[in-house]
A protein has these predicted regions:
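PIN-domain endoribonuclease scaffold, especially VapC-family toxins
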Residues: 28-83
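Short, flexible helix/strand-to-coil boundary loops that buttress conserved ligand/catalytic motifs
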Residues: 15-16, 50, 120, 137
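Residues at secondary-structure transition points
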Residues: 20, 37, 59-62, 87-94
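Short secondary-structure boundary segments
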Residues: 8, 40-41, 111-113
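Short, active-site-adjacent cap segments at secondary-structure transitions
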Residues: 11-12, 44-45, 115-117
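Acidic, PIN/NYN-like endoribonuclease modules and their adjacent C-terminal/linker elements
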Residues: 94-97, 101-139
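Short, well-structured N-terminal submotif of metal-dependent ribonuclease cores
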Residues: 1-38
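Mid-chain, well-packed structural core segment of small domains
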Residues: 73-108
Length: 139
């Protein structure tokens, strides 16, 4: 089964609109059509961003906790250890690359290709949600 990492901006976009590729990607995750790869660090980032945006999303903190619990159940959790020297343009995105390397997931989906493009040098594909959706929709 395909395993991939979702940048926080994809999770947020999936909750802001039920019409885009990000929303469809999360629907397919819920149906078990692919596996999300998570680390504790990434899950905490999801939580921080979603709780900060909870009023805009029409969610309470309890709603966010329930949502993240459901996502966690559809994910493979991988523990990350000591940080390495940053290799990406935005050091805040470094845990995504480290997670991909540690988990064997070869795909990161994000709305911010520019910061993650150097991941390709490490054998990690970085795709926009619409491109990832095409992959997981193929028969």
């Amino acid at each position: 089964m395909l395993r991939a990492i979702l940048d926080t901006n994809v999770i947020l976009a999936s909750l802001l609109s039920n019409r885009g590729a990000s929303f469809e990607i999360l629907q397919k995750l819920r149906r078990g059509e692919w596996r999300l790869v998570l680390s504790n660090h990434l899950l905490l980032e999801y939580e921080e961003v979603l709780k900060r945006n909870a009023p805009t999303l029409g969610m309470t903190f309890d709603d966010v906790d329930r949502y993240l619990n459901a996502i966690s159940k559809a994910a493979d959790c991988v523990e990350l250890f000591a940080p390495q020297t940053p290799r990406l343009l935005d050091p805040d995105d470094e845990p995504l690359l480290r997670l991909a390397e540690a988990s064997g997931a070869r795909l990161i989906t994000t709305h911010n290709l520019r910061h993650l493009r150097p991941a390709a040098a490490h054998g990690i594909a970085v795709l926009l949600p619409r491109d990832f959706l095409r992959i997981i929709t193929q028969p």
